[in-house]
Amino acid sequence: MEESVGSRGGSGGGGLDAQIEQLMECRPLSETEVKTLCEKAKEILMEESNVQPVKSPVTICGDIHGQFHDLVELFRIGGKCPDTNYLFMGDYVDRGYYSVETVTLLVALKVRYPQRITILRGNHESRQITQVYGFYDECLRKYGSANVWKIFTDLFDYFPLTALVESEIFCLHGGLSPSIDNLDSVRSLDRVQEVPHEGPMCDLLWSDPDDRCGWGISPRGAGYTFGQDISEQFNHSNNLKLVARAHQLVMEGYNWAHEQKVVTIFSAPNYCYRCGNMASILEVDDCRNHTFIQFEPAPRRGEPDVTRRTPDYFL
């Protein structure tokens, strides 16, 4: 008989640890195990806010997109969870070849160490998008049915939309919204739904910073572009130092915008296995100093192992 997480000790127990170990070897869980795991995750995520408070020190990460081996590399460089406190800003699935293993591992870590990892929703944590960009097909291929896809996409509805590190770094997948000028407006949204095609929840997951001032029409067909004037006003009104977001490929792994009011963090190196970009993660320490750690794809055997650390003392 196949044992579930629950029958092997629950979220504190060895059963989950064994599953995490299995996932770290890129071996998927059974459908039954995924179902039990996601039921536990839902209970935890239901209690979290649309603006989930996070304490420093914390390591902030951008898109992963099913690049499982690069996620393992990220943990090697940034430190294991729970030794390191992590905040992931969405887009765990699609495009890469290991969306199933990637999202299952992150959800398992969330259930095992709920206070040490925060997982936000990205625009790809959606039923519609995953049917086009790979996660749906991957679930079908690996499990023989769409059940696991349905279990995960139902869970995605509960992922928090944003996080707030030490009341001064606002973290979210996409960007700002013309419908939202303060954090209480975010807190009051009903997030338990498929990502809408328009409106504030859509914007938070789809918008991008832009060189042009004001609000602009997004070339993505969802969300908006927003200028430095918008970022400055938003940060000022909400007593924020910084908006940290993901959602856009940046060649160095991170990119400042709007005179260091906004930073983009992208954590999938050599994106889609062909873009040649670096990835990065942002470490915020106890004193709220910021260090970007850049990394390259997980080394294949015989290749050099290179990491570049870039301290950043802008505060």
Curated annotation (Swiss-Prot):
The keyword Magnesium does not apply. Mn(2+) 1 binds at D63, H65, D91. It catalyses: O-phospho-L-seryl-[protein] + H2O = L-seryl-[protein] + phosphate; O-phospho-L-threonyl-[protein] + H2O = L-threonyl-[protein] + phosphate. GO terms for molecular function: metal ion binding; protein serine/threonine phosphatase activity. Keywords: Cytoplasm, Hydrolase, Manganese, Metal-binding, Protein phosphatase. Coiled coil: none annotated. Its cofactor is Mn(2+). Gene3D superfamilies: 3.60.21.10. It holds the Pfam family Metallophos. InterPro entries: Calcineurin-like_PHP_ApaH (IPR004843), Metallo-depent_PP-like (IPR029052), PPA2-like (IPR047129), Ser/Thr-sp_prot-phosphatase (IPR006186). One of its GO terms (cellular component) is cytoplasm. The active site is at H124. Mn(2+) 2 binds at D91, N123, H173, H247. The keyword Manganese applies. It comes from the Eukaryota. It is found in: Cytoplasm. Its EC number is 3.1.3.16. PANTHER family: SERINE/THREONINE-PROTEIN PHOSPHATASE PP2A-RELATED (PTHR45619). Belongs to the PPP phosphatase family. PP-2A subfamily. This is Putative serine/threonine-protein phosphatase PP2A-4 catalytic subunit. The gene is PP2A4.
